[in-house]
Curated annotation (Swiss-Prot):
Record: active site: S473
UniProt lineage: Bacteria, Bacillati, Bacillota, Bacilli, Bacillales
Top EC class for this record: lyase
Free-text remark on how the cofactor is bound: Binds 1 [2Fe-2S] cluster per subunit. This cluster acts as a Lewis acid cofactor.
Entry keyword set: 2Fe-2S, Amino-acid biosynthesis, Branched-chain amino acid biosynthesis, Iron, Iron-sulfur, Lyase, Magnesium, Metal-binding
An annotated GO BP: L-valine biosynthetic process
Protein name stated in the entry: Dihydroxy-acid dehydratase
Family: Belongs to the IlvD/Edd family.
A GO cellular component annotation in the UniProt record: cytosol
Function: Functions in the biosynthesis of branched-chain amino acids. Catalyzes the dehydration of (2R,3R)-2,3-dihydroxy-3-methylpentanoate (2,3-dihydroxy-3-methylvalerate) into 2-oxo-3-methylpentanoate (2-oxo-3-methylvalerate) and of (2R)-2,3-dihydroxy-3-methylbutanoate (2,3-dihydroxyisovalerate) into 2-oxo-3-methylbutanoate (2-oxoisovalerate), the penultimate precursor to L-isoleucine and L-valine, respectively.
GO terms, molecular function: 2 iron, 2 sulfur cluster binding; dihydroxy-acid dehydratase activity; magnesium ion binding
Lineage top rank: taxon: Bacteria
Assembly notes: Homodimer.
Amino acid sequence: MRSDKIKKGVEQAPARSLLHATGQIKSPGDMDKPFIAICNSYIDIVPGHVHLRELADVAKEAIREAGGIPFEFNTIGVDDGIAMGHIGMRYSLPSREVIADAAETVINAHWFDGVFYIPNCDKITPGMLLASVRTNVPAIFCSGGPMKAGLSAHGKALTLSSVFEAVGAFKDGSMSQEDFLDMEANACPTCGSCAGMFTANSMNCLMEILGMAVPGNGTTLAVSDARRELIRESAFHLMDLVKKDIRPRDIITKDAIDDAFALDMAMGGSTNTVLHTLALANEAGIEDYDLERINDIAKRVPYLSKIAPSSSYSMHDVHEAGGVSAIVKELVDLGGAIHPDRITVTGKTIRENVADAKINNTDVIHPKENPYSPVGGLSMLFGNIAPKGAAIKVGGVDPSVQVFKGEAICFSSHDEAVEAIDNHTVREGHVVVIRYEGPKGGPGMPEMLAPTSSIVGRGLGKDVALITDGRFSGATRGIAVGHISPEAAAGGPIALVHDGDIITIDLPNRTLNVDVSDEVLEERRKELPKFKAKVKTGYLARYTALVTSAHTGGILQIPEDLID
């Protein structure tokens, strides 16, 4: 066992003495059992994580029952909804790297034999996922689960995206104060990750098809007894993985990454999943995985389930309609869409895991014969603004919009753009360009949910587009193109767009171009000032120095002269 490094031999007597002091060693025989880390992320200010201490207790009990010795530790967490629209959002994406580094540190310092990861919200799940393939210790994931959808006084289903869009409607005078306050009070009625197909739930669903979580992980409600049963079930599977020495890199292969994107396409997941899954591929040592490959997957995978914010259906609706397993079963039966014979943490293949799944509500999950669209709900766009690519959730765009051509109105920050939208400087026919908000420029690639929500809230969702080197919340909908790469701070051509330039977003052809010649763009480049970091001290300064653009997953890259 790995843990023998800290508990066997005369030299480890001091370590054993300290282990006895933890109270986790109940009998001398416990030193002969596998040591299992519980990587938890309990935190009071994140509603998706307030109940995780209780879930960790369930995991501890089950691990002991299955023959292991549990040791819990915690990582940090950032609530993107609370951090939205101010400097706090600059810390959200960077927190992914802190979480990965923290988990790696504890796991490798103490030589655990297995790891039970309990994430839930936006950057916590991918951060832990990066740690799992980096440490490559037998591991399983079981998230905290989604919250219930809210209900307005008028009987309308609510999610957090409803409130963000209500801000624009209230400011515009099209929503009463009474209705506005009703939404605020009732949109988030329980603990759990926000109720729509936003980033947290998208990632927790992808964990099922990646093979790192048991079926039901993505959709079983946080407040349900079934969530606790999933925790127990996962603990027993983990002990089996430890016994058989099945590791994350045995499960997360190039085929698994392909299949994660396939599920993403079928359920119209958050564009943030692209960022995190590319980072995962890099961390797992999977080479030559680029955005063009994702478009190839989109062409063969139909869009089967349209969930909030793209519809009124919540994650609980998806669960009752058959869950992720029902969607995956459609992809298995489609043939050629995914690789169904890969191993998973259950010890079974993807095909075996979903063999008995079925669609219980064809309004929520469409059968493969009747998809929302024959192609997936996410697209990667390329062109002279985004030579390395950009991402759009086409499932969140009104179907009547196939090609959007408009006049650029440029901003060098999120706040400038929000002010212009709110004071009606932005008008019908504009393409809002927000740059210097990428991983390096932000820093931290902050989400642009406030401007997109204001656009939709004002009723301009089909008439105004927004493009950015920043990213979007999973709650974003409308003509919103993010992750433009290279970013402006890295010299990307989005920095060369001027007010009044004509920009064309062509969804069928997956292109994003500005109607300016290469010669003119090069002349503009000569006048472009050198980027200067916005933050000079602390973690964000170090992050700015090392982070790369979105097409890599926004990973940190060690300078080559240090590793050659």
